[in-house]
Amino acid sequence: MDVTALGSGQPRRIALVAHDNKKADLLEWAAFNVETLMRHRLVATGTTGRLLHDRLELAVERVESGPHGGDLQIGAQIVQGEIDLLVFFWDPLEPQPHDPDVRALLRITVLRDVPTACNRSTADYLISSPLFALRAAA
């Protein structure tokens, strides 16, 4: 995370991803935080992005769905320094056909020091962090 930009007033670029069994959880979290999310640039994998747009009227850049390379597209944006926060509600109990892509995405967030939330509690901590608010202040 580039802490030198804190307080710059720049909106953050937030990636939102959810496996099928976790989409309802992500939508509930996003609805609770919709006012905050509206002030930032959002990118999401296919179906997740469509749901966020259709149900919450959020402006969302959509990449491919996860199994079709969307996780890798978000990972590439992380490598390019284009993602500031990843909220990824993944299902640890359900094997995914694209598990290697999921692992690669989570690995690159660690390598690039991108704050990552894999559940609601962590997402709540990150989005309510004073550091998050400082960076997002207008």
Please tell me what each predicted stretch does.
Residues 68-108:
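Mid-chain, well-packed structural core segment of small domains
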Residues 117-138:
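Short, glycine-/small-residue-rich phosphate/pyrophosphate-handling segment
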Residues 41, 58-69:
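Short hydrophobic/aromatic-enriched beta-strand-loop microsegments
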Residues 39-48, 52:
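Short internal beta-strands
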Residues 43-45, 62-64, 88, 116-120:
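General beta-strand structural signal in soluble alpha/beta enzymes
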Residues 24-42:
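Glycine-rich, flexible N-terminal cofactor/catalytic loop recognition
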